């Protein structure tokens, strides 16, 4: 009987939820000595409850009679449910209604939607996975041989007709739609390349192909006329325009203080029909003859200081460069011819007042040296020693004035 406390403690620890009172625990005790053994067996079987379900409710151990505990009278609920489980599951499945959304899954919905979208939108010869305006079309991977053939065809013809498209589709193992889309993309790429090429090289191509005209320097305040083309001959009107511009520049130089005293004022009002001396040598537009040259020069100013007479377009200043070079450019034939150099005359009375020979003017021009009678036509850009003629003017009195030049009727 020493083991009974041990079993009581272990039974309480293992089955805390099934704690029994003392009256229930010892309900099977007998009156005799065998009752001790019976109480031991009953105690063990009550502690480990599955043995109670095997016994009958009215049976006792050791032949003794005792009170039957209510726990042993109860049947095991697990044994009752074990037989009725299949029946209850079948009844639950039969009573519940299964809706379509219960069977839906993400993978099943994708598999069911893909055939529905591709039906009715694919072309002949195209797989269902490629087509469909609503679905995403797969990217076509072209081989190098296909790209070479497509590029060759695009080089010769940028727009394909239907028979040629069918022929290329059969030859390259592609669909008509793939070839059509490739040509559309290739045309857009070609337009973009042409636009970039035209915008980048448009500004520099014009300057590289067209020759630039030579740079010319003009004095401030003068508006030069249109320059003639290098391959065309200058016309008469262009030469007249050039002579007018040169005469305007000569009139600008007339206002300089160093040359403001030439020509004398009494000669200006005495010859009203003659053009100004600065513009006489500028109206010639052809070969210059000695007679024309002699008739166009202005009278020698009676001055004691050696100053060149401003006759032409560009008169060389003492601080300027050579007389045949103006502003770094070679002088024109008209400029070189109009430039003359005179020797200083003998000192005499002041030319401001009218002299006794003012109305007569019977003296003739001085003679030129014999080696300067002819003016070569091909040496327009030669130095001043060849073109400019040196005159020996011998003015003895105030009345010795140069005769007026005749009218120029050939111009």
Curated annotation (Swiss-Prot):
What GO biological process, any one, is recorded here?
A: regulation of transcription by RNA polymerase II
Write out the ranges of the annotated region (Disordered). 51-90, 104-138, 192-377
Instruction: Write out the entry's keywords from A to Z.
Output: Developmental protein, DNA-binding, Homeobox, Nucleus, Transcription, Transcription regulation
Compositional bias per record (Low complexity), positions renumbered to this chain: 235-251
Q: Which Pfam families match?
A: Homeodomain
Where composition is biased (Polar residues), the residues are 67-90, 108-121
Q: Which domain of life is it from?
A: Eukaryota
| Molecular-function GO terms, alphabetical | DNA-binding transcription factor activity, RNA polymerase II-specific; RNA polymerase II cis-regulatory region sequence-specific DNA binding
Q: Gene3D superfamilies annotated for this entry?
A: Homeodomain-like
Locate the motif Antp-type hexapeptide: 98-103
Q: What is its main location?
A: nucleus
Q: Where is the composition biased (Gly residues)?
A: 197-207
What InterPro entries does UniProt report for this protein, alphabetically?
HD, HD_metazoa, Homeobox_Antennapedia_CS, Homeobox_CS, Homeodomain-like_sf
Compartment annotation: Nucleus
For this protein, the record's SUPFAM superfamilies field holds: Homeodomain-like
The DNA-binding region ranges are 135-194
The reply on keyword ATP-binding is: no
Its cellular-component GO annotations read: nucleus
- Give a yes or no for keyword ATP-binding in this entry: no
- Skewed-composition ranges (Pro residues): 211-231, 299-309, 344-354
- Family as reported in the entry's similarity comment: Belongs to the Antp homeobox family.
Annotated protein name in UniProt: Homeobox protein HOX3
What lineage is this protein's organism placed in?
Answer: Eukaryota, Metazoa, Chordata, Cephalochordata, Leptocardii
